From Swiss-Prot:
Binding site for S-adenosyl-L-methionine: 216-219, 235, 255, 271
Catalytic activity: cytidine(2498) in 23S rRNA + S-adenosyl-L-methionine = 2'-O-methylcytidine(2498) in 23S rRNA + S-adenosyl-L-homocysteine + H(+)
Protein name listed in UniProt: Ribosomal RNA large subunit methyltransferase M
One BP term from GO: rRNA processing
Provenance organism: Saccharophagus degradans (strain 2-40 / ATCC 43961 / DSM 17024)
Family the UniProt entry places it in: Belongs to the class I-like SAM-binding methyltransferase superfamily. RNA methyltransferase RlmE family. RlmM subfamily.
Purpose: Catalyzes the 2'-O-methylation at nucleotide C2498 in 23S rRNA.
E.C. number: 2.1.1.186
Active site: 300 (proton acceptor)
Length: 349
């Protein structure tokens, strides 16, 4: 059995390190196979029981660099152009009952070129499955069809209760026309990732007070204003005029690393481009003073040792809060709209 882990192109090494560490901690044997810039990693498992144990032991939401995952019995090669579906149908005999079957693609130029082929083959297989009565709407397993090239593909499955919110791990969010930058989508995606949709009305509510550190030109502030919050935007740079015209934003032209709020707020957000450890220390200072209830922040990772750097930044925050006796939850995720960075979510209790 092979666990396929999809990721941002160029982050295969980080995924390999992360899934190896998580599997080892759970006592699950396996080894990685990876190629640079392919957008995926293979984690080879000894048998079906190991795959089942892995899904039970590792929570997908605890993984940072893995965008999406599923298990496949094997990767089929040398698929005939006249009938690519039959070899995949044969491989599907080893799968549990599926609730549905989805086409997914790698987030690379080669992967995008295979969208039409993947959809066509998947639609054909769906028709065959439906005629055979093979789908079970009550099943937790979702089938996946992925093409690596025109001649190589696989069919696999993952549990709906322990996987990505989005098909293939890619969200379908539209950039608002009046937002000052596309960075606004990072915060929107972060809310989807870290906060259950049914809790939005309580946790992302109108009239809440928020601080945006390093706010200019206002991509993240726009999201807060759009949720009818009152925002202190901290940045020496200029803010977009339409955001300031809302009447909900106070522009503090100060150094984000030195700013201290006059009173605690509900939301702290930050997309500062600085050394990740320095940003982690900034978030820690705010947390130790209990100046917020929830925070979303980005850490810009270095080109080398990104996985190690993230662990160090996480330790900066957790060690300080543990020593202070503060209850919290801290999670990280490399979002689809992130680049050489990861997004953190810290909740204080």
């Amino acid at each position: 059995m092979i666990l396929i882990c999809l990721c941002r192109q160029g982050f295969e090494k980080e995924v390999a390190a992360e899934i190896t560490d998580c599997a080892a901690y759970a006592g699950i044997a396996g080894y990685v196979k990876t190629n640079a810039d392919t957008g995926y990693v293979e984690f080879v498992l000894p048998d079906l029981d190991s795959a089942t144990a892995l899904f039970e032991a590792i929570r997908f939401d605890d993984l940072v660099f893995v965008r999406h995952w599923f298990v496949t019995p094997a990767i089929a090669s040398d698929l005939p152009k006249e009938d690519r579906a039959s070899p995949l149908m044969a491989s599907a005999q080893a799968l549990p009952p599926l609730a549905k079957l989805e086409p997914i693609t790698l987030d690379t130029n080669d992967g995008k070129a295979l969208v039409a082929l993947t959809r066509g083959v998947t639609n054909h297989m769906r028709t065959v499955f439906k005629k055979a009565g093979a789908f079970n709407a009550k099943s937790d397993w979702v089938g996946q069809v992925l093409f690596f090239s025109g001649e190589q593909a696989c069919i696999g499955y993952f549990p709906q209760s322990n996987g990505s919110l989005w098909v293939g791990g890619i969200p379908r969010l539209r950039a608002p026309k009046d937002a000052p930058s596309r960075a606004t989508l990072k915060l929107e995606e972060a809310w989807h990732q870290f906060i259950p949709r049914e809790q939005w009305d309580q946790r992302i509510a109108p009239s809440m007070r928020a601080v945006d550190l390093g706010a200019a030109p206002g991509g993240w502030t726009w999201q807060l204003v759009n949720k009818s919050m009152f925002v202190e935007a901290v940045d020496n740079g200029p803010m977009a005029e339409n955001i300031m015209a809302s009447g909900q934003v106070t522009h503090r032209m100060e150094d984000a690393f030195r700013f201290a709020p006059e009173r605690a707020v509900h939301w702290l957000v930050s997309d500062i481009a600085d050394k990740p450890a320095r940003v982690a220390e900034l978030i820690t200072r705010w947390a130790e003073n209990k100046w917020f209830k929830e925070a979303v922040f980005n850490l810009k990772l270095p080109m080398k040792k990104r996985y190690i750097e993230l662990q160090l930044c996480s330790e900066i925050i957790t060690l300080a809060l543990d020593n202070a006796g503060i209850e919290y939850t801290l999670k990280f995720k490399q979002l689809y709209h992130d680049r050489e960075e990861v997004t953190g979510h810290l909740v204080l209790f």
